[in-house]
Curated annotation (Swiss-Prot):
Region entry Disordered, spans: 283-317
Entry's EC annotation: 3.4.24.-
Residue numbers annotated as active site: E131
Protein name: Protease HtpX homolog
Biased composition (Gly residues): 306-317
Pfam family, one: Peptidase_M48
Keyword Aminoacyl-tRNA synthetase in record: no
Cofactors, names only: Zn(2+)
Keywords: Cell inner membrane, Cell membrane, Hydrolase, Membrane, Metal-binding, Metalloprotease, Protease, Transmembrane, Transmembrane helix, Zinc
GO terms for cellular component: plasma membrane
Amino acid sequence: MNHLKTAILLAGLTALFMAVGFAIGGRGGMMIAFVVASATNLFSYWNSDKMVLRMYGAREVDETTAPDFVRMVHELARRADLPPPRVFIMDNPQPNAFATGRNPQNAAVAATTGLLQSLSPEEVAGVMAHELAHIKHYDTLTMTMTATIAGAISMLANFGLLFGGGNRNNNNPFGAIGTILMVILAPLAAMLVQMAISRSREYEADRGGAEILGRPMALASALAKISGAAHEVPNYEAESNPATAHMFIINPLSGARMDNLFSTHPAVENRIAALRALSQQMGGGGFAPGPAPAVRPPGGNPWGVDPGGGQRRGPWG
């Protein structure tokens, strides 16, 4: 079912991409846009995860550089019957995280330094379990490819604003006014297509993550903390690339932008209420939680590398 939803979502975005091409260059522009969209879909399938990780400056860590954090993620993956994903850390003060990858065999999870330094070990485990649930449901393929294609739609629309104006002619059937309208509406439409699926998937990942960890309220507590900080601590990379906002566990946009009017995430209060209800249903049961990793005093470098180049152990190993 998730593969069908992914196909429908990508078809919708491809059609939108072609519509922008038609607005800019008529039938010729539409055909070029179709070729570009098809190539983008193919390229995104194989490379979108690498692009997003590079976009956020994520660094891969292992059991040498961040042993506690990596072992925790691998233990959660074992409980979820998933192969261990690659683990990345982003040098960003905003507490947040996302997962990416075309399938569980090629998946990765990424957390910010802000998340590792401001949340308790149980809360971090709840966040990582949520991301692993996305991987298990194959949400990461849809989220990452959607981010790439939606970004391409915005770029094409901006191109149309710069070069697609002028008088109405065969190459530009809508003229300057039509092109401007398309520039405004196309990115918004792309965001609406993203919203069609991503909100329900967040609830499913919350539930799946809570079941993996066995502690729904650990995730609920993490959501409350991350949500509060996301409005106070800016994520400049996300502000520059709002098409990737739906990938994060909490919307990373500050709220000062128009993008936030079309949030890809359900209200945090509703997510917490659903987790609280799940906790009552589980009655303290669910999967038996493993021991949370010991956290060291805050202020260290989660990568375990000091400015002088020597190795030292940070709060996550």
